[in-house]
Design a protein with these regions (language model features):
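C-terminal leucine-rich, beta-strand-based interaction scaffolds used for sensing/assembly
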Residues: 15, 181, 250, 254-423
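The catalytic "switch" region of P-loop NTPases
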Residues: 123-256
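Amphipathic alpha-helical surface "interface" segments used
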Residues: 62-85, 244-258, 388-393
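Short, hydrophobic, well-ordered secondary-structure elements
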Residues: 43-48, 144, 165-168, 188-191, ...
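Short beta-alpha junction loops
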Residues: 16-19, 191-195, 382
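P-loop NTPase nucleotide-binding core
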Residues: 2-143, 153, 158, 358-361, ...
Length: 423
């Protein structure tokens, strides 16, 4: 669904449920790896998506060049009314040659050329589509194509990094081409940092370094509170009552902290976390206007069990063996909220996963992803001082893991695991 604000058209494109197995058939050559393997296929899908926005959302239907491209695509079998999944299926059929006759007939008519390969077909078509976009007049309107839902690719074992790398390369290529022509069209990719870290390509490193923005709320907690207030406003709370809304809903103090800080301690400082907590408040106590301390803690237990623990498992999917992921809640439950070492969690992992041997390297990888995602913290001692501090990545984005230190689980996991909360 498009979101329009003034002259800006923000269009979400969710890759959740994307047919990666089908898309994998569209590689230009089985011998090619890295960013070029799927770039041409991504170029086509992204350009086709932009044409759908230009034609269907902005309703630019009176420019001959645009109409010619739209008509040509329709004749080739790619309708602007079709969904993303259908486009991927048609593209894969084109690659393997099952729908090539109709496409080639229109291609020869348009370009006066008989194509020999999939790459030739799609590259020439992409060039035509991009050239027309670079010349179209948007009348000060802006388009943002926002691509999210990359998590599903982690479940796809083969070529997943080539697919991600090619998408990043494609978005960068199209963005640069449109920017050079001063067109206010931008493709935005919302990608987890741990997924980006898996892409090993020197050229992509420069693209990511120059064009990536890291989203962190660790130093923007006031903005996070404003976002929550916006949610209250959308729920019907009057503007003048927004600042007092949280205080009116929750206890003033819990364990020497105000209730806002107490709730944040059970999150990773992500908007989604705190909004999910509010959803569970409504779900658990739909008739209550203000929760007691006991009721708020009951909500945190439901939030931890049904959301926070599941989010942790989802974040590990595709990086860590599935059997080990399933065992993690049991491993953490046995730890009981206390500090643990690399060797101890390796021992517990092998006790829980009896069907396979979990090596120290496997355990290091598990700890690294848990630490990077914020679900475990590092206990650090300074000199001879007995008092230790806890470092979490989501609070300190520059933190680096040290496997020789002890670790501790995030407080947001404890209630769902049924372990004693640390004081």
């Amino acid at each position: 669904m498009a979101s329009k604000s003034g002259s800006l058209y923000a269009i979400p494109m969710d890759l959740g449920g994307f047919e990666f197995t089908t898309f994998a058939k569209t590689s230009i050559d089985s011998e090619v790896t890295g960013t070029q393997k799927y770039k041409s296929s991504w170029d086509f899908l992204l350009l086709l998506s932009i044409y759908k926005i230009v034609f269907n959302e902005l309703q630019i239907t009176e420019i001959d060049e645009v109409n010619e491209v739209v008509f040509m695509l329709d004749k080739m079998g790619f309708s602007l009314d079709s969904g993303f999944k259908a486009d991927v299926t048609k593209l894969s059929k084109l690659k393997i040659g099952t729908s090539i006759v109709q496409f080639d007939a229109e291609f020869e008519k348009e370009f006066n050329l008989q194509p020999r390969t999939y790459l030739e077909r799609i590259s020439i078509l992409n060039e035509k589509m991009l050239k027309v976009l670079c010349d179209v007049e948007l009348n000060d309107r802006q388009i943002s194509l926002i691509i999210d839902g990359f998590d599903d690719i982690l479940r796809y074992k083969k070529n997943k990094m080539d697919i991600v790398a090619s998408l990043i390369r494609s978005a960068d290529y199209i963005n640069n081409a449109l920017m050079m022509k001063k067109k206010k069209i931008k493709i935005l990719l919302l990608v987890r940092e741990d997924l980006i870290a898996m892409v090993v390509d020197p050229d992509l490193n420069k693209i990511i370094h120059d064009g990536a923005i890291s989203l962190s709320w660790s130093n923007r907690l006031d903005d996070l509170k404003e976002l929550v207030n916006l949610r209250f406003k959308l729920s019907g709370v009057r503007e003048k009552d927004l600042n007092a809304c949280w205080k009116n809903m929750f206890p003033n103090k819990i364990k020497n902290k105000n209730s806002w800080e107490y709730a944040l301690d059970h999150t990773l400082y992500k908007p989604r976390d705190i909004l999910q907590f509010l959803n569970y408040c409504k779900e658990e106590y739909p008739q209550k206007e203000k929760l007691t301390i006991s009721e708020m803690q009951n909500v945190l237990k439901a939030y931890s069990n049904r959301y926070f623990i599941e989010e942790m498992k989802n974040e590990l999917s595709g990086f860590i063996d599935d059997d080990l992921i399933v065992s993690i809640p049991s491993i953490f439950r046995r730890l009981g909220g206390r500090a643990f070492s690399l060797s101890e969690i390796n021992k517990l992992s092998n006790e829980q996963c009896t069907k396979k041997n979990i090596t120290i390297d496997d355990t290091k990888m598990l700890l690294m992803y848990l630490f990077e995602a914020g679900y475990i913290g590092q206990l650090v001692s300074s000199g001879k001082d007995v008092k230790r501090s806890v470092i979490f990545k989501y609070r300190n984005p520059t933190a680096r893991i040290d496997y020789y230190q002890q670790f501790i689980t995030h407080q947001g996991l404890h209630r769902g695991l049924g372990v004693r909360l640390l004081k």
